[in-house]
């Protein structure tokens, strides 16, 4: 496979929109023992400024194993990283963000609290596709494949140690990078099902006056309607109805709503609107719940779920 490569599962071109200097991110670290009170002594345990290069990154996350062609259709090592993400998916996301970020700034400057948006068919397509790809490229949807692959390798290793099964020693496990892609973000049937459904949903753009929409290592939040607890994140696009939230920048949010379940969204369909800090806090909670390791705040304000020490 050649040299090990560090590859981002949330692209740096996206993360920079939440960076306070263009190269670093105010980061809340999950998995730490979290206190309810922030002090100068303990806040460095879970709030840090981290380089864009060191978050949402993994070794050989997209690298195809060319020595395992039977399990990856003989693809070249860098085809996912270069041909799909670098040459196609990420430029499309960058263009979409640029287009609607400019509109968001205009809305804020003009104090237009609600305005209709004349989306082109191409814009609607690539907004949905960008959300679909980013949702599926996250590690959460890869963990089960890694577990299956580990079990397979252990079984093959055990069997190969028996003289009667020596031929199994040359059998490789899954190519996890390929299988992840094939089952999720490169799965055309799954994409068609997603797009057919979401094309009938209401699309809204929200603009925060405060400019502190969080993002995370799982930035696209999809909530299954009617579910409770952790089951809200277990979405089947074939059967379930859902809502989607995708922060494009620290002040711009993309949202989709089922009009049958949320009839009030019909009058807001294809609009861009300014929201207050209360609304910002609500969708920021979604990022916190959806994240695995990192939550990012442009303003370094994590007071939503960590209270500052009282003076009293």
What are these model-derived regions, one by one?
Residues 1-6, 10-312:
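Alpha-helical structural context detector biased toward long hydrophobic helices
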């Amino acid at each position: 496979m050649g040299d090990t490569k560090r590859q981002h599962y949330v692209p740096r071109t996206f993360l920079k929109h939440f960076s306070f200097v263009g190269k670093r991110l105010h980061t809340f670290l999950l998995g730490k023992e979290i206190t309810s009170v922030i002090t100068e002594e303990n806040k460095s345990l879970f709030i840090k400024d981290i380089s864009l290069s060191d978050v949402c990154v993994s070794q050989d996350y997209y690298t195809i194993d060319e020595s395992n062609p039977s399990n990856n259709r003989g693809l070249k090592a860098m085809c996912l990283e270069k041909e799909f993400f670098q040459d196609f998916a990420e430029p499309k996301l960058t263009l979409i963000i640029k287009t609607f970020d400019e509109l968001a700034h205009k809305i804020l400057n003009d104090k237009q609290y609600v305005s209709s948006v004349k989306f082109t068919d191409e814009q609607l397509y690539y907004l949905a596709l960008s959300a679909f790809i980013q949702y599926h490229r996250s590690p959460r949807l890869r963990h089960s494949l890694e577990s299956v692959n580990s079990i397979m390798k252990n079984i093959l290793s055990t069997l190969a140690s028996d003289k009667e099964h020596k031929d199994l020693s040359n059998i490789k496990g899954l190519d996890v990078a390929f299988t992840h892609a094939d089952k999720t973000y490169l799965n055309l049937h799954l994409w068609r099902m997603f797009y057919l459904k979401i094309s009938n949903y209401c699309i809204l753009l929200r603009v925060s006056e405060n400019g502190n929409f969080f993002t995370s290592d799982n930035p696209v939040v999809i909530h299954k309607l009617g579910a409770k607890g952790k089951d809200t994140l277990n979405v089947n696009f074939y059967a379930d109805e859902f809502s989607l939230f995708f922060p494009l920048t620290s002040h711009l949010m993309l949202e989709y709503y089922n009009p049958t379940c949320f009839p009030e969204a019909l009058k807001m369909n294809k609009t861009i609107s300014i929201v207050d800090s209360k609304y910002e806090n609500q969708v920021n909670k979604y990022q916190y719940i959806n994240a695995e390791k990192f939550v990012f705040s442009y303003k370094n304000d994590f007071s939503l779920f960590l209270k500052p020490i009282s003076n009293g």
